[in-house]
């Protein structure tokens, strides 16, 4: 028998590379087999045309030199001039190439930041429209080599949109809002520290996926970033990013003229305010001449903004746009503006209406260097939402889409969720503006409405963890974001497989296994967290992590489900509801207005229906809930065995790191499944046709065991404990024992123990069979996993440990001893004994 929950013993395997910690991401440049003619085809010289010190051209040459050395043990010299293509790779801008190589092959037409890569006829030519484009081409060439692709190619590629940014929600104290990969790499104790050593590697990763801008601080901004010493620090950050073609920008606090500048107003039309922002902007550009611009969150979730002074959001955005215009900077102005104190008692209130209500009347009133940054859905990064109708309502305004790489509502990197298939439901959706093809991707590029600016922003939130995001597999989402921002019609699985080959090597089983797991992960998470468009049924008032469907309703945040004993869902129709459907162009509105034509996966987003409403699948809503939550959790169980099939094919450190998370996810998916099903079973009173919900024949409730030093505890929310109760030690210094005589047939079982591991202590548990040790463990999720922790017994802290292949004899006595620590009273929920092949 063996325990599966926290870090397991690392076993060295013959032939494996030295253990890796994830710091290199996909830029590992791991050894690639290349012999004979292949080896001879590799360049021995690298010609960098007209490089300046620390320019993207110089970086491109260094990257290729390093890549060739690490992948093929080949030392290539770097030379600053020359046009000979024999055994050489030539890197440069189009202008430099035409000047230095007048008789060379003509280069096809390139758009801004585009590049031409040619490896035919024994040549390697990487020519960019700009220095940044040439660097992108160098990374493209290295990507091919690292995947074992030596086929001759010749093609040009250019970006889908000019803005391809990432946002970091880093705070000045070094913490991070909704970051699950450690502390900030930019800030500490209110300042920008001297040690910025991780920033260069982040710049490399971003450049390799063609990201050209970064906002380094939280949208809930602290005005102290604008102090002179911190502006100096921003200059140091920008100096690190600049050679990689990534421009630095910052988030602003709208009230800074008052909170930092000492003015008695922050009215955007006040001359003193205008002058103050002009001076601050000038000071920033003195230090960072190529600063990207500003990101602004205003009049949302308590943040200050122009409406305080009865000014419009456009007047607020234009304040910054005019200060930036002489310097060439842009304003990304977030459309995430809504009232979080609206009353659910009013049937017609709807947070989803807010963006169009606020911004549509302002179309055409923004300066040309303003870009309205719009979240992909009308609410907030949910597991499934319809596309935001605001994209279809701004004809005369630049727009960008806002995605989330950090998994705020989607498992917080403790659950595997590959996000591009979700994003593609938004990017490819045809909004049919004026009855014409209008996919979202063509609106944000500026193509559909002939706008000069537009593009992409993603909240990433890398941190000091060596995996960057808290999980090795989560990095696939950052990689894919960059690839899609360049070309949004790429296939999500193709992108994923490029990332797998660069990250984990070329073994076919590794490729197929991680592909299968990843492509199944978003549908599985949707199934066990919230489906039919009901949103992610997480605790929206606390951690945004574990299940708590009741938290959606009864408050002013507007993420309502309107679930009661008879019906569920938001009526957003024109006929009877909030009229949200009317914000879409007519062809789309007509689809969503009618239950019969609304897709099942968005039914509860647009309609309030009885639990017995039949779906297009033929199932009732409530039975679909039950079935989907079981199906999703069942899929999550398979991730463990799939990953275990790769033992010996992946270096031990990364293998064990991922395995720990997948084992945890398998257990937590059951917590999700049971919590949601029990909640709606209790609310609706409708039984599961398959008699699974509320029936757990393999479980023994902890409160039904013989207790010594333990006492029963009513868990809140009730559905996050099996049978609503758990047990805790009588005091925080009392060791507790729970024991029971087993009435199961003799045989081998997997012994699962569900417990609660919350912040504020590291309890210890030991399990015995007839006084024979089965296993022991510690409540140390805070040291092992990435998600936001709870200080309660709830769906966030609920965890399962499993001991496999335990030999049980009927009549054996199972005993669990819990030793509390700190605030944590060694809580237990239940034990389960599962015959092999049975999922609880």
UniProtKB/Swiss-Prot annotation:
Residues of the signal peptide: 1-19
Subcellular location: Secreted
Highest taxon, organism lineage: Eukaryota
Glycan attachment points: 222, 310, 465, 527, 576, 682, 732
Keywords linked to the UniProt accession: Carbohydrate metabolism, Glycoprotein, Glycosidase, Hydrolase, Polysaccharide degradation, Secreted, Signal, Xylan degradation
Molecular function, one GO term: alpha-glucuronidase activity
Any GO BP: xylan catabolic process
CDD domains referenced in this protein's UniProt entry, alphabetically: CBM6-CBM35-CBM36_like
EC annotation from Swiss-Prot or TrEMBL: 3.2.1.139
Family of this protein: Belongs to the glycosyl hydrolase 67 family.
Protein name listed in UniProt: Probable alpha-glucuronidase A
Lineage, top ranks: Eukaryota, Fungi, Dikarya, Ascomycota, Pezizomycotina
Gene behind the chain: aguA
